[in-house]
């Protein structure tokens, strides 16, 4: 993969090698920090993860993935920007498409309106984060940045919920592959 071609920013010709080295040297670090340090998009960093750590699904799979997530129970919904990281533990409510938005509604702290046509790809990410396994489904926009992320929940002992890990792995197998979305 040539990051200079894939990114909207002009990347260093050696950026891919530098990103891969950073990921190898610090496999459980913050991916947004890797992107910033190497002047590449977040998506480019995801694309440099080993195949066992990231698989990509087409944006056309959004409804299938979202519908499945509504039956997982409590997960962690995260929005990570340069200005902060916002997270809430919640169930994923059902949604409907209307007036150019995917409208989220239901008995959950999570509600709102997504411009889902801006979703360019959906990544299934399974990697260590601060020395613990972390599984997430990440929705990326056309600029290569994360719109939001949905993480498999943890129990009181901070272990991933095994039933959600099984659902994550099954959904990844059914909808994603390593490579272009």
Where are these regions (language model features)?
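Eukaryotic intrinsically disordered, low-complexity regulatory linkers and tails enriched in Ser/Thr/Pro
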Residues: 1-181
């Amino acid at each position: 993969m040539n990051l200079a071609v894939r990114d909207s920013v002009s990347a260093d010709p050696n950026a891919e090698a530098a990103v891969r080295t950073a990921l190898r040297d610090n496999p459980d670090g913050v991916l947004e920090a890797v992107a910033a340090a190497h002047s590449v998009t977040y998506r480019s960093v995801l694309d440099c993860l080993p195949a066992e750590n990231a698989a990509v699904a087409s944006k056309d799979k959004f409804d299938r993935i979202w519908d499945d997530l509504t039956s997982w129970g409590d997960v962690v919904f995260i929005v990570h920007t340069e200005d902060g990281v916002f997270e809430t533990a919640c169930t994923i409510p059902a949604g409907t498409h209307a007036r150019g938005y995917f409208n989220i509604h239901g008995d959950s702290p999570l509600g709102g309106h997504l411009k889902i046509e801006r979703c360019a790809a959906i990544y299934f990410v399974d990697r260590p984060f601060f020395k613990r396994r972390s599984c997430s489904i990440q929705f990326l926009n056309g600029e290569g940045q994360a719109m939001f992320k949905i993480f498999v929940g943890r129990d009181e002992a901070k272990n991933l919920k095994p039933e959600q890990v099984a659902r994550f792995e099954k959904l990844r197998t059914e909808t994603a592959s390593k490579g272009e979305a």
